[in-house]
Regions:
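Generic secondary-structure signature for well-ordered alpha-helical cores
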Residues: 73-80, 108, 153-157, 188-192, ...
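Active-site beta->alpha loop and helix N-cap motifs at the rims of alpha/beta catalytic domains
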Residues: 9-13, 17-25, 29-33, 38-132
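Active-site-proximal helix-loop elements at catalytic-domain edges
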Residues: 1-9
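Electropositive phosphate-/nucleotide-binding environments in soluble metabolic enzymes
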Residues: 20, 62-65, 69, 100, ...
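A residue-level signal for conserved active-site and pocket-lining positions in enzyme catalytic cores
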Residues: 115, 213, 281
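Ligand-binding grooves and catalytic loops that recognize ribose/phosphate and carbohydrate rings
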Residues: 50-57, 61-65, 154-157, 181-189, ...
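Catalytic alpha/beta core domains of metabolic enzymes, predominantly
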Residues: 121, 127, 136-255
Length: 297
């Protein structure tokens, strides 16, 4: 059976992965693919990288960048009309200037890149300048409505399609909080705004995350291979009007009264999960590189 994207669905579907073989398979299963998101952890899980590490071999810093570039160029060629998110290296000490330097280089790799910066103070500084230079950006590791407001303020004046914000659902669920409430809250926050920031639902762990994000009207959803394969296997169902998201024991995350008119530096954007996510991504990146060759900071 050949599947096609329902004309009733406005949400774009991205694959969250670092293996072009998965890209090819998901395109075949769905009959379409609107884009792809990558990050250091996903690149470290690429079969070629895992084989190399399994042999006790590591990369030089330039080799790992060349490998990452090769992966995203292959993916870009498969979805030339879609977006491919490419993530800079960022740990707790990485400056905006370093992120921006990396971002400029990565943006030149492919014609359809969105550069991922963390939703941290330095990440927002980098994104603010990147947008002014005409780059497309994706603010990742977002866990709160306040952080999303800061993304909006830092990128004010950008064109629609130039800025994504990626709230992470599953990692909030892991803390016992209803991560889908954060998606709903951010979508509601932006409803009366100018539309220059698009909501990209990320850290999707199950089919209900996917279905509820579609129901909420998320601009984009990125999901791993297994979940998109499961969705395709069921015929790519859309949530019915009677659909109810199974909250279970997750605690609600109430909406807040937040103005989008303030300078971005006035928002309290600190979040422990953002810090933890940066630590995890940077550790996975460093694990690919021989100790004596680590230079990124």
């Amino acid at each position: 059976m050949i599947l096609m994207k329902s004309p009733e669905m406005n949400t774009r579907i991205f694959l969250d992965g670092g293996d072009p073989a998965e890209t090819e398979e998901i395109k075949r299963l769905l009959g379409f693919l609107d884009g792809q998101t990558t990050n250091p952890t996903l690149i470290a899980k690429n079969p070629e990288a895992r084989r190399r590490l399994g042999q006790g071999l590591k990369y030089t810093e330039q080799e790992v960048l060349d490998f990452y570039r090769g992966v995203v160029r292959t993916v870009s060629g498969m979805i030339p009309d879609g977006s491919v998110s490419v993530e800079v290296y960022a740990d707790a000490t990485t400056t905006a200037e370093s992120m921006l330097k990396q971002g400029r280089e990565m943006f030149s790799w492919i014609p359809n890149a969105h550069i991922k910066f963390p939703t941290s103070t330095e990440g927002l500084r980098a994104a603010e300048q990147a947008v002014k230079e005409g780059m497309r950006v994706n603010l990742t590791l977002c866990f709160s409505e306040v952080q999303a407001a800061a993304v909006y303020a830092a990128t004010r004046g950008a064109a629609k399609g130039q800025v994504f914000v990626s709230p992470f659902v599953g990692r909030l669920d892991d803390r016992g909080e209803n991560g889908m409430d954060v998606i709903a809250n951010i979508i509601a926050l932006f409803r009366q705004a100018d539309g220059h920031v698009e909501v990209l639902t990320a850290s999707v762990r199950n089919l209900d995350h996917l279905l509820y994000a579609i129901r909420l009207g998320s601009d984009i959803i990125t999901a791993p291979y297994g979940i998109l394969k499961e969705w395709a296997g069921q015929g790519m169902p859309l949530p019915s009007p009677e659909y109810r998201y199974p909250v279970g024991a997750l605690q609600p995350v109430p909406r807040r009264e937040i103005s989008l008119e303030r300078p971005w530096r006035e928002y309290d954007i600190g979040h422990p999960l953002t810090d933890r996510g940066m630590e995890k991504f940077s550790a996975d990146w460093k694990a690919l590189i021989a100790t004596e060759d680590r230079k990124i900071a």
